Each structure stands twice: as C-alpha cells, then as structure tokens.
A protein has these predicted regions:
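Gly/Ser-rich oxyanion-binding loop with an adjacent helix/lid
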Residues: 1-43, 208
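C-terminal nucleotide
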Residues: 36-208
Length: 208
C-alpha cells in the first residue's frame, strides 16, 4: 500500500479487499493502509454515477495541492475528518448503515467546502452533480437508505445496500441513463490474465 500511495491515495486503499483504513502517518513508512479488524457484514453496494467522463479541467493532484496551500478551511477539514474515523470504524463494525452514510456525506461535503474556498475559488461540481445529490436526498426522504459521496471530481457515488439498488436505479436512470455502475466491496488486489479481465469487464457491463 505504501508503493501504491506514491501513485494515488485512492490506490493505497485499494490494495486490500473489504473495508480499509489508511493511516495518515508522518513519513513514507508510517503512511499505509490495512484492512479493518472487524469487517461489515452488510450487503453494501455503491452506485457510481458518471456525471462527466471528460478530463478534469483541474487535476485532483493540482486541485488538492492548491487547497492545502490556500484554503482557510483545509486544516479544519483535516481535523474534522480525523474526528470521524473512530465513529466510522464503530459504525462499520456494528453494521450501522445510517451512521456510515451520515459520516461519509459529512467527510465528502466538508472536503468540497475546503476546495471551494481555495484561491482562486474553484469547484468540481457540475449541474448534474447537484442533481444526483438531490435525487439521493429525495430517495432518502422516501425512506430509502442512500448516501452520496464524491472524490475530487464531478462524479457521484451512492452508498446503499443490495435490496435498494433497483429502486435507486429506477430513480436515477431517467436523468443519467446507462452512466451508472453498480459495485460492491472488492477483494484484494491481484494479478489477472487478459481473459479474466475481459470476463470481469463483461460482467460489470451487464449489471443493471
């Protein structure tokens, strides 16, 4: 995970399967990821809504570097995010989807608040980004457990569980069509053959 981190923070978390914690650390040796001791048993699913497949006008690396350097909210976001870690570990261990979702949304939106406050002001949000968030909130108001999150980009990921995937797809497709990918917690990273890759790609493409 340390080697993967040098390419991407997201890659750090993707080396291991299941729910993973990335230790911030203070140098190369202490900044690494590892699986959580207690994994959730919930049938977690994530719907990835592709708002835009275009190259980002500002790369994640450049955008976040400028956030660190110029946003007055950056330090507050880091402190806030660190305060969410232990509650999230507990929520995952206790299969508390409502709390998992709440903490996920808080972390994501506070990060984007810090990004918007950088100099010069900037946002990754597009009009359809906001529409996706609105749809999630509308579904949650109807009693559907759905929670939105984003990384440094315009696309929206929606956390839910298996029984509600079709309901959410029905709500999302009139706006986003086939730009929705349904995923779940994956296994450890591994080396696969081209045939295995093609089979996996086909299986993903065939998902509802």
């Amino acid at each position: 995970s340390r080697l993967a981190r040098r390419g991407s923070g997201s890659a750090t978390r993707s080396i291991f399967g299941g729910a993973v914690i990335w230790h911030r650390g203070h140098d190369d040796a202490s900044s690494f990821a590892e699986p959580l001791a207690i994994q959730p048993s919930l049938p977690l699913r994530m719907l990835v809504v592709t708002v835009s497949a275009e190259k980002k006008a500002v790369s994640s690396r450049k955008g976040m570097a400028n956030t660190v350097a110029t946003s007055p909210y950056y330090d507050a976001w880091v402190a806030s995010n660190e305060s969410l870690i232990e509650p999230m570990i507990t929520a995952l261990a206790e299969d508390d989807l409502a709390l998992i979702g709440k903490l996920t949304e808080l972390s994501s939106m506070r990060m984007h608040a810090a990004i918007m406050a950088e100099e010069p002001p900037f946002t990754y949000f597009l009009p359809e980004t906001l529409r996706a968030w609105q749809l999630v909130q509308e579904q949650r108001a109807l009693g559907i457990p759905a929670f939105a999150t984003m990384d440094a980009g315009p696309n929206v990921k929606i956390l839910t569980t298996e029984p509600y995937v079709d309901i959410l797809l029905t709500a999302l497709r009139p706006v986003f069509g086939d730009r929705i990918l349904s995923t779940r917690l994956g296994p450890d990273a591994s080396i696969i053959t081209k045939e295995q890759f093609d089979d996996t790609k086909s299986a993903i493409a065939s998902q509802g």
